[in-house]
Each structure stands twice: as structure tokens, then as C-alpha cells.
A protein has these predicted regions:
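Short polybasic amphipathic segments
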Residues: 19-21, 51-52
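Conserved DEDDh/DEDDy metal-dependent 3′-5′ exonuclease domain
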Residues: 37-149, 156
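Short beta-strand elements in bilobed, periplasmic/extracellular small-molecule ligand-binding domains
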Residues: 31, 49-60, 166-173
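Flexible loop/turn segments at secondary-structure boundaries
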Residues: 3-6, 28, 94-98
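A generic structural motif
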Residues: 22-24, 159
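C-terminal or mid-to-C-terminal helical accessory/interaction module adjacent to the motor/catalytic core
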Residues: 149-174
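Entry/capping segment at the start of metal-dependent catalytic domains
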Residues: 1-20
Length: 174
């Protein structure tokens, strides 16, 4: 849920309203707590098609709506993450994963359900079976393609390195 300020992941004050998973099979799977009608889903698919046309890639859009945040987070961990071999993202470790784990704790969901052996490791409580790679950390330390880094926002870096910005979504997921 979006508020006027950027939320502190250790406190996770606002509900998670959507999660996007991009698979190796080029599927953009969106889990959300607000339903999107077919017209909006079709519009999103068209935006995805247009966005990736310049690099010759095609991705499919799959949408799954849940009645509440608890059901969405539980399904994400117990169904999706449990099958992952790898989790990646931009600022994924310090923000996304920490926020999800802390929201789960507030809702009474044990993060270890994401692991086939019901175990997590480290201060971030990653499932034991999953490799984790944060692209922001890798870029900040190893990137040599951009001499002067304006900032570390995903939009800025994507444009500078590969010429692609984030897909703009004009609607709301609240």
C-alpha cells in the first residue's frame, strides 16, 4: 500500500497489495489484493508487449487476485517461493524481502513455510534452498559500463546500462 512516505521495511507499516514474479519462462505473474478487470489486464499485456518490443522479447501477463493480504503472502511463500531456486531483484534484500518477512510476522505467517524443509537462514530469513542475488548490490560494486552514476534508482540504471526504463503504470493498486 502506498502512502506519502517511503515505508521502513523493518517496521512494514502498510499492507503488501501486489507482488510481481518474473519467471525464466518469460511470464510476469502478478499477485494482488485488488481485482483487475479483463480490459485492464489486456492493457497491461499491451504495455508489456510494447515495452519489450525494442529488444525482441515477449512476456506473458498472468494475474491472480486474492481476498486479502494474508492469503496473498501465504500463497507467495508456500506455493511460489518454495519452488524457486533463485530470488533476485533491485534492492530486493534490503527492502522487498525484509518488508515481506516483517509483514508476514505481523500477520502470523511463519516465513519458514517458504522452505521445503521449513528452515530459513541468516538475519534476512531466506529459505534454505534458495540462492539470493540483489542486482543493486552487484551494480553498485561491479558495474563498469557507467562512469558517473547519477543515482542508484532502477529507472536511471536501466536507462543508462541497457536503454530500458521501468514500465509506467498509470493506475493504482490500492
Amino acid at each position: 500500500e502506498v502512502t506519502d512516505s517511503f515505508p521502513e521495511p523493518s517496521k512494514a507499516p502498510n499492507p503488501v497489495t501486489a507482488i510481481c514474479i518474473v519467471t525464466p519462462e518469460k511470464q510476469c505473474i502478478v499477485l494482488a489484493t485488488k481485482n483487475l478487470d479483463r480490459k485492464i489486464q489486456s492493457k497491461i499485456q499491451k504495455q508489456i508487449d510494447e515495452h519489450f518490443k525494442s529488444i525482441g522479447e515477449e512476456f506473458s501477463f498472468i494475474f491472480k487476485c486474492f481476498d486479502n493480504e494474508y492469503d496473498m503472502l501465504y500463497t507467495f511463500l508456500a506455493t511460489f517461493v518454495k519452488k524457486f531456486s533463485m530470488m533476485t531483484g533491485w534492492n530486493f534484500v534490503q527492502f522487498d524481502w525484509q518488508y515481506i518477512v516483517n509483514r508476514c510476522k505481523k500477520l502470523g505467517i511463519d516465513p519458514s513455510i517458504a522452505s521445503p524443509i521449513a528452515r530459513t537462514f541468516g538475519k534476512h530469513e531466506f529459505p534454505c534452498h534458495v540462492g539470493v542475488m540483489d542486482y543493486l548490490d552487484i551494480y553498485a560494486k561491479w558495474d563498469k559500463t557507467v562512469d558517473i552514476k547519477e543515482d542508484f534508482k532502477l529507472d536511471t540504471v536501466g536507462e543508462a546500462v541497457v536503454g530500458i526504463r521501468k514500465i509506467k503504470y498509470e493506475g493504482t493498486i490500492q
